């Protein structure tokens, strides 16, 4: 999901058109305005007092031979999208709005021809290693060179560059 959302955003912002105004925000919306203000603590449909912890067991029919759901070959394990966090996440109670998860904020052209993303300094990989701009650029470029063909076709002409 992380890579998919990241790439969706890049595709939206890679259109070659004249730049209009420059927007800077924590959240952004493709349709209208984001529902939640900067610094919101939880989505309205989430119970922040819900018990935390425990074990979740999910069943799946079939087999898998890959944890990389974007690989050209093989059968990925069910729910592998839960292994990856996106730069931005969506809310379930509004369409087309994106809120930072690994990202901290975004700066972008009003016509979505480019986007600059600041990463959350607290963002970490599962092993505790900080996520860097180089990691994001590496992931995108890996998809462009070794990912599924649809990815390369969809994001043709899109570039990602780590600037910090």
Language model segments and positions:
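Surface-exposed binding/hinge segments that line
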Residues: 152-164
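Ca2+-coordinating acidic residues in Ca2+-binding motifs
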Residues: 135
